[in-house]
From Swiss-Prot:
Binds 2 calcium ions per subunit. The gene is PON1. It comes from Homo sapiens (Human). Changing residue 102 to V: Probable risk factor for prostate cancer; results in decreased activity. It is an enzyme of class 3 (hydrolase). This is Serum paraoxonase/arylesterase 1. InterPro entries: 6-blade_b-propeller_TolB-like, Arylesterase, Paraoxonase1, Serum_paraoxonase/arylesterase.
C-alpha cells in the first residue's frame, strides 16, 4: 500500500510538472518561428553593437537610445562596460549615432546600466530625459536635462523608492512624475526565477511623484513596456509573458481604470506611440525561449507590430516587420518618424528602415 501511495504521488507530481512545463513553454511562445516580412530599404545603424533596448523620438526628429543593458538572464555582448545614451538626428540623410556625455558630480557613469527611457518637455521647452538605471543590479530612475548645444545630459537627480524595486520601463508625465512598470515582485534573483517559472503574475505598475508614490495596477505576468496616448487620457501597458497589451483610462488623480486588453501571438515588449496618429508601434519577441536561453546558432527573432484604432471595438493589427535573427536579434522597440522606422534590440544592433 505504501508503495502504491508513493507511486500515485509521484505520478501526480510528474503530471503537474508536465502541465506546468507546457504552460511555461506556452508563455514563452517556445515553438513559434517567424515568416519574414521585409521592408523595402533597411540599414543597420552604425555604432550600435550592444543593444538599443529603448528609444524615444522627439517631434523634431532627435532620437534618444539606451544602449548596453545588462539584465539578469539575458545575453550581453559587452558585459564589462557601462551603458550609454545615444543621440540620432533622423533629419539627416544618413543619420549616425552620437554618445551623449553625462555631466553632474554625483552621478556614477561607471555603473550606468540604462533600461527604459522617457522624455518630458516643459512649457519653457526644457527637455528632461528619465532613465531606468540598474547600478549593481538595483533599480533607480535618473533624471537628466538635455543640453542640445553641448550634446550632453546634465544629471539632476537619482530617484529611489521601495515601490520601484524592479523597474523595466517608464513613461514621464512631468519632470519628476512618471508611471513605471516593475517586471518582478521579488528582489532576490532566486525567488525571481521561481516567480517567472511559476507564472505568479505579481508584477505591478506604480505612479511616482515627489509627493506621492502608489501602486496603480497589478497582477501582471512580467509588466514591461508602458506609454501614454497623445491626449494623455489613456495608458498602455505591455504584459510580456501573457502576450497582452492593456488599455487603462487615466484619471485626474493619476489612478488607472482598466478598459480593455488585446491578445497577441508574440511577447510584447516596449510600446511607442505616434504623436500624430496615436498608433502604437510595438517591438516584440516572437519566441521568448530564444531570448532567455540564448543560442548563437539559433538566435532570437525580431518582430514589429503596428496597432491602429486601439480604442475602437475593432483595432487593426499589422505585422510590419519580421526577421528570424540573421539580421536583427531580439527586437524590443520600434518608433516612426516621417515615413521611417527605427527598430531597437535588447542586446544586439538597431535597424533603420523606410516604410
Amino acid at each position: 500500500m505504501a508503495k502504491l501511495i508513493a507511486l500515485t504521488l509521484l505520478g501526480m507530481g510528474l503530471a503537474l510538472f508536465r502541465n506546468h512545463q507546457s504552460s511555461y513553454q506556452t508563455r514563452l511562445n517556445a515553438l513559434r518561428e517567424v515568416q519574414p516580412v521585409e521592408l523595402p530599404n533597411c540599414n543597420l545603424v552604425k555604432g550600435i553593437e550592444t543593444g538599443s533596448e529603448d528609444l524615444e523620438i522627439l517631434p523634431n526628429g532627435l532620437a534618444f537610445i539606451s544602449s548596453g543593458l545588462k539584465y539578469p538572464g539575458i545575453k550581453s555582448f559587452n558585459p564589462n562596460s557601462p551603458g550609454k545614451i545615444l543621440l540620432m538626428d533622423l533629419n539627416e540623410e544618413d543619420p549616425t549615432v552620437l554618445e551623449l556625455g553625462i555631466t553632474g558630480s554625483k552621478f556614477d557613469v561607471s555603473s550606468f546600466n540604462p533600461h527604459g527611457i522617457s522624455t518630458f518637455t516643459d512649457e519653457d521647452n526644457a527637455m528632461y530625459l528619465l532613465v531606468v538605471n540598474h547600478p549593481d543590479a538595483k533599480s533607480t530612475v535618473e533624471l537628466f536635462k538635455f543640453q542640445e548645444e553641448e550634446k550632453s545630459l546634465l544629471h539632476l537627480k537619482t530617484i529611489r523608492h521601495k515601490l520601484l524595486p524592479n523597474l523595466n520601463d517608464i513613461v514621464a508625465v512631468g519632470p519628476e512624475h512618471f508611471y513605471g512598470t516593475n517586471d518582478h515582485y521579488f528582489l532576490d534573483p532566486y525567488l525571481q526565477s521561481w516567480e517567472m517559472y511559476l507564472g505568479l503574475a505579481w508584477s505591478y505598475v506604480v505612479y511616482y511623484s515627489p509627493s506621492e508614490v502608489r501602486v496603480v495596477a497589478e497582477g501582471f505576468d512580467f509588466a514591461n513596456g508602458i506609454n501614454i496616448s497623445p491626449d494623455g487620457k489613456y495608458v498602455y501597458i505591455a504584459e510580456l509573458l501573457a502576450h497582452k497589451i492593456h488599455v487603462y483610462e487615466k484619471h485626474a488623480n493619476w489612478t488607472l481604470t482598466p478598459l480593455k486588453s488585446l491578445d497577441f501571438n508574440t511577447l510584447v515588449d516596449n510600446i511607442s506611440v505616434d504623436p500624430e496618429t496615436g498608433d502604437l508601434w510595438v517591438g516584440c519577441h516572437p519566441n521568448g525561449m530564444k531570448i532567455f536561453f540564448y543560442d548563437s546558432e539559433n538566435p532570437p527573432a525580431s518582430e514589429v507590430l503596428r496597432i491602429q484604432n486601439i480604442l475602437t471595438e475593432e483595432p487593426k493589427v499589422t505585422q510590419v516587420y519580421a526577421e528570424n535573427g540573421t539580421v536583427l536579434q531580439g527586437s524590443t522597440v520600434a518608433s516612426v518618424y516621417k515615413g521611417k522606422l527605427l527598430i531597437g534590440t535588447v542586446f544586439h544592433k538597431a535597424l533603420y528602415c523606410e516604410l
